[in-house]
């Protein structure tokens, strides 16, 4: 469990801390994290997936806190779920192809502003409740 928590939650925060000064220098000050819809506490009606759900839920808490802390620096922060994507890890039953996921993620990043910082987005542009 700890290796998954380190990869999904701790490493993204440490990387953000290491790159913080770089974010301040950017023209478009945006930090985007890839989470997953199963990390939503509100949307959890299926149970199971304890390691993945809990580590990504913890990441979402980090993301929300960063959005509050960094807004004064003009940095927008978002959590994005790429959807269930047809990849080696997503498997053949996944619902969307890579192009659909990436196109949606790119659109969300392009539209990310301080006004909508601290949100949890699905790849299709819909908000996911925390």
Q: Over which residues does each language-model region extend?
A:
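Catalytic loop of short-chain dehydrogenase/reductase
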Residues: 1-6, 10-14, 20-71
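Flexible, glycine-rich beta-alpha linker
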Residues: 39-41, 68, 72-96
């Amino acid at each position: 469990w700890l290796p998954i928590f380190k990869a999904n939650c701790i490493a993204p925060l440490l990387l953000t801390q290491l790159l913080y000064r770089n974010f301040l220098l950017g023209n478009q000050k945006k930090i985007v994290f890839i989470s997953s819809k199963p990390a939503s506490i509100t949307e959890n009606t299926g149970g199971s997936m304890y390691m993945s759900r809990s580590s990504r839920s913890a990441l979402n808490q980090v993301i929300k806190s960063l959005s509050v802390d960094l807004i004064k620096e003009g940095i927008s922060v978002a959590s994005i779920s790429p959807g269930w994507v047809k990849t080696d890890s997503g498997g053949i039953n996944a619902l969307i192809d890579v192009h659909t996921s990436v196109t949606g993620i790119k659109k969300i990043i392009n539209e990310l502003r301080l006004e909508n910082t601290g949100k949890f987005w699905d790849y299709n542009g819909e908000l996911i409740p925390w």
